[in-house]
């Protein structure tokens, strides 16, 4: 309380809770399934490929970023990604949009790795394909009593090119229900 004739002490502003302008705070982007370290790695990639420093990535920059992070990046895919994520219609994506994209891709990549492990259990000869013989062996190990015609039908459903073998891509498509009929 101020004495008569004296000014009260000035009120101090509370410390800033938000990020200071120009400073990146990864904690603002952390969410379940995504660590601060992963956010920093994705931000590092974003900054590396934001070659013009606009804080947004255009199609050419996005293709380079995706390739460097180990993802296949065809032009059609790149333009589709930008179209799907570009909320302001600028034809480019900002960091928040890029983070959303990369988080989805990381999750997809992890899922694909898990499916690869299951595929490898079926591919007993490590030939890169699952054959009727492989399927017969797995069915027997699991105690399933299926005749060859049932097993062959399973192969035929998954086999995309009619060679009586299931490739990993065929298996992945079935497991993710992309081509299951």
Curated annotation (Swiss-Prot):
Ca(2+) 2 binds at residues 86, 88, 90, 92, 97. Residues 14-23 have a biased composition (Low complexity). One of its GO terms (molecular function) is calcium ion binding. Ca(2+) 1 binds at residues 50, 52, 54, 56, 61. Residues 1-29 are annotated as: Disordered. InterPro entries: CALM/Myosin/TropC-like, EF-hand-dom_pair, EF_Hand_1_Ca_BS, EF_hand_dom. Its main location: cytoplasm. GO terms for cellular component: cytoplasm; cytoskeleton. Signal peptide: none annotated. It comes from the Eukaryota. Residues 37-72, 73-108, 110-145, 146-181 form the EF-hand domain. Keywords: Calcium, Cytoplasm, Cytoskeleton, Metal-binding, Repeat. Pfam families: EF-hand_7 (PF13499). It is found in: Cytoplasm, Cytoskeleton. Monomer. Plays a fundamental role in microtubule organizing center structure and function. Component of the infraciliary lattice (ICL) and the ciliary basal bodies. Belongs to the centrin family. This is Caltractin ICL1a. It comes from Paramecium tetraurelia.
